[in-house]
């Protein structure tokens, strides 16, 4: 059940997309901390720029509307899915003299290297019909596109209208909001493992997650509840197999996940973990050069307890 770094249109990707499509990703902000409740909070930082993206149905395809231009630096993305199908908002920066169509082809390609001019800058994980997802991140100046690869059987959603472009102007980076949990994808110069996750603070229910990467390679994290009687080794074997046998060792219906971030980046996103117990944190991607095994087979699979 392998997936490529961008295309991700394999049976695993479709299964993950179907699972995340029914997860309530659009969450209200986490509760105020004690200082805020007592009226002693420090002065609030500067408000982020607002990036709003909405995808809806349009005949046989989709229609996506996005804010045309925003100030760079700290940005709050609000992604709303008004359609009948699952959608995602993967933000990419397009450097040089390249088009959004080129970006779609490069991102959804099943093989080959990811070009240097296409930078994966985070965004919102898959949102099901009627759901809203919110993520805060820093964006550099440039030309951007929102790509959507949450297809299941046919062409990628971006080829059917789930695509938008926008400009980001100069702005000062800002501090990300406080998080209640952290997951970091790490590239090790001296392995094994070549890649690994560090995680803390994940809990049952709503999480304000800081997802970060340290290194040069892109990562995401997908979190699966491990079914009773199953082990992390069985999970890895299942996902690494082209033709797995038997029932899956994880609960797809209660999975949660993030968009893809290039190396040395961070974002804060709201997601919900709906089942207590052990979870497998998994990265299905490969390196930017398109070579080598999936990151999950190179150390980027981790078990955490959620209560």
Set out the residue ranges of the language-model regions.
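Bacterial N-terminal signal peptides that target proteins for export
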Residues: 2-19
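Contiguous segments within soluble domain cores/interaction surfaces
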Residues: 74, 81-109, 206, 213-242
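A substrate-binding/cap region within the structured catalytic cores of diverse enzymes
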Residues: 196
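C-terminal motif of bacterial Sec signal peptides marking the signal peptidase cleavage site
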Residues: 26-29
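Extended, solvent-exposed segments with strong compositional bias
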Residues: 113-128, 245-262
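Post-signal peptide N-terminal segment of mature Sec-exported envelope proteins
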Residues: 39-54
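Bacterial signal peptide processing site
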Residues: 31-34
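Extracellular/periplasmic metallocenter environments
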Residues: 52-61, 67-72, 76-90, 122-191, ...
């Amino acid at each position: 059940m392998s997936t490529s770094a961008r295309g991700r249109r394999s049976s695993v990707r479709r299964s993950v997309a179907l699972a995340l499509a029914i997860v309530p990703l659009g969450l209200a902000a986490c509760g105020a901390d004690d200082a805020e409740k007592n009226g002693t909070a420090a002065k609030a930082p500067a408000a982020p720029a607002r990036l709003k993206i909405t995808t809806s149905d349009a005949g046989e395809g989709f229609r996506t509307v996005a804010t045309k231009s925003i100030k760079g630096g700290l940005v709050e993305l609000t992604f709303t899915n008004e359609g009948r199908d699952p959608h995602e908002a993967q933000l990419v920066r397009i450097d040089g003299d390249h088009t959004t169509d080129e970006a779609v082809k490069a991102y959804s390609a099943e093989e080959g290297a990811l070009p240097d001019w296409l930078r994966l800058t985070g965004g919102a994980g898959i949102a099901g019909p009627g759901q809203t997802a919110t993520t805060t991140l820093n964006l550099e100046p440039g030309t951007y596109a929102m790509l959507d690869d949450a297809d299941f059987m046919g062409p990628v959603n971006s080829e059917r209208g789930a695509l938008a472009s926008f400009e980001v102007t100069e702005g000062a980076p800002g501090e990300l909001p406080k998080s209640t949990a952290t997951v970091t994808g790490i590239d090790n110069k001296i392995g094994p493992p070549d890649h690994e996750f560090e995680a803390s603070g994940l809990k049952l229910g709503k999480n304000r997650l800081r997802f970060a990467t340290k290194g040069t390679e892109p990562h995401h994290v997908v979190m699966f509840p491990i079914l009773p009687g199953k082990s992390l080794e069985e999970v890895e074997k299942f996902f690494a197999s082209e033709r797995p046998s038997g029932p899956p060792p994880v609960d797809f219906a209660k999975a949660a996940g993030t968009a893809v971030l290039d190396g040395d980046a961070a974002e804060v996103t709201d997601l919900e973990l709906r089942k207590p117990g052990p979870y497998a944190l998994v990265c299905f991607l490969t390196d930017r050069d398109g070579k080598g095994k999936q990151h999950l087979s190179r150390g980027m699979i981790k078990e955490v307890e959620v209560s």
